[in-house]
Amino acid sequence: ETVSSGYVRFDHKFASDINLMAGLRMEHTSLRYTGRNYDDETDKTTKTGRMTNSYVNFLPSILVKWDVNDDFKIRGSYTQTLSRPKYSALVPSVNINRGDNEIKIGNSDLKPTISYNFDLSADYYFKSVGLVSAGFFYKKIDDFIVDQVLTNYEYQGTEYTRFTQPKNAGNANLWGLEFSYQRDFGFIAPALKYVGFYGTYTYTHSRVEDFNFEGRENESGLSLPGSPEHTANASLYFEKGGLNVRLSYNFASDFIDEMGPSTFYDRYYDAVNYMDVNASYTFGKKVKMTFYAEANNLLNQPLRYYQGTKDRTMQAEYYGVRMNAGLKISF
């Protein structure tokens, strides 16, 4: 894959409180690829023919910042972005597993995913360290890519129990709200200035349009695969001198991870709740030494997939708490 690009950019300041940045980026993508067909029964590979492709994209962007005053900022933007298919998805390869009667093939006809993005946010900065912000975003996504999984599917005269191929599955609209807050607690009492909190929350609503998935073309009401509806992060920290202690929490709701021939076969990545704690102490001037310790996954959150509904577990893996400690020396 060879990418050639160029851009123009224009910056302008209106009065003293409004800043504009506009630009246009052009990218030319050229592809040359070959693949290999693998058969596990014979343990042999055969090389496929060489294929080529190319496309050009023009990606505009406009960003505006309004400094309402020293503490309050409003930002708005429109951007167009590009996400190229993974190499492994593009390569015209065929992988046959005779034991399980499964086949995986690449798709050299995949188009890049284009996203049209609108963002609006407002930030307020406290007199002391910290800020509170709120934002709205909207994305129109064309030609998103998913792995299409079909069962009992015939390919080149042979029926396979499971057939997998990446494909452009349609378009999607996505909008959401995001909030963040960061501040130390010195405004409550001076003794608490070393203690602080940081948190974010994002709500995302997505709907798929023009669903191009064999056997499910007329389906509606689907969420965009890989897009959780709720995500949140929170961190409570203590920082004084060389001592740093932080307790962190992360949450993401469940989402579709893999599309099946019907909703019954859709694979979901289950909701996760992670909690970690880490601490470090740094001392020294010419030679700095840092003792650190951390413990991850305090809640023993499993890696879990389910099929269709939450009560149909496909896979669950528990890793327990992971701990690490050590010493760093820098000079």
Residue ranges and their predicted role:
Residues 138-140, 158-256:
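Gram-negative outer-membrane beta-barrel transporters
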Residues 15-17, 71, 129, 186-195, ...:
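Short loop/turn motifs that connect adjacent beta-strands in outer-membrane beta-barrel proteins
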Residues 195, 251-259, 280-331:
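C-terminal beta-signal and adjacent terminal beta-strands/loops
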Residues 26-32, 78-84, 91-93, 138-142, ...:
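Transmembrane beta-strands of outer-membrane beta-barrel pores
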Residues 32-41, 87-93, 100-101, 145-151, ...:
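Outer-membrane beta-barrel translocator domains and adjoining extracellular loop/strand segments
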Residues 20-24, 74-76, 132-134, 177, ...:
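Transmembrane beta-strands of outer-membrane beta-barrel proteins
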Residues 1-69, 95-96:
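Signature of Gram-negative outer-membrane beta-barrel scaffolds
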Residues 1-4, 53, 82-141, 157-184, ...:
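Outer-membrane beta-barrel signature, preferentially recognizing the C-terminal barrel domain
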